[in-house]
Amino acid sequence: MQKLIEEITKEQLRTDLPAFRPGDTLRVHVKVVEGNRERIQVFEGVVIKRRGGGISETFTVRKISYGVGVERTFPLHTPKIAKIEVVRHGKVRRAKLYYLRELRGKAARIKEIRR
């Protein structure tokens, strides 16, 4: 049974996604349906966590919009994501960056690494 589940989910996995980690800044292009129209909405922010594995893997992106922190969690392998761009790679020592929620302004900056 487990083997069958793995085979089915393997077909659903996306291979066109870039490698990214917590601390990286991403630009996520999301397909949004409004009435009978479909458009692309861009959400840019810092990855604060990645969790799960396989088809159920998710990642959370945080940005500050008009002074308010906004976090959005995306399933990694969803067809709703048109594309993901890595804007910059950040150097962090944690897998979950929940501490960024408490920091404001320059304190919330993440050191950039060149790859």
From Swiss-Prot:
GO molecular function: structural constituent of ribosome
An annotated GO cellular component: cytosolic large ribosomal subunit
PROSITE patterns: RIBOSOMAL_L19
A Pfam entry, by short name: Ribosomal_L19
Record key words, sorted: Ribonucleoprotein, Ribosomal protein
GO process terms (BP): translation
Cell membrane recorded as keyword: no
UniProt xrefs under InterPro entries: Ribosomal_bL19 (IPR001857), Ribosomal_bL19_CS (IPR018257), Ribosomal_bL19_sf (IPR038657), Translation_prot_SH3-like_sf (IPR008991)
PANTHER family assigned: LARGE RIBOSOMAL SUBUNIT PROTEIN BL19M (PTHR15680:SF9), RIBOSOMAL PROTEIN L19 (PTHR15680)
NCBIfam families named among the record's database cross-references: rplS_bact
Known role: This protein is located at the 30S-50S ribosomal subunit interface and may play a role in the structure and function of the aminoacyl-tRNA binding site.
Record-stated family: Belongs to the bacterial ribosomal protein bL19 family.
Record-given protein name: Large ribosomal subunit protein bL19
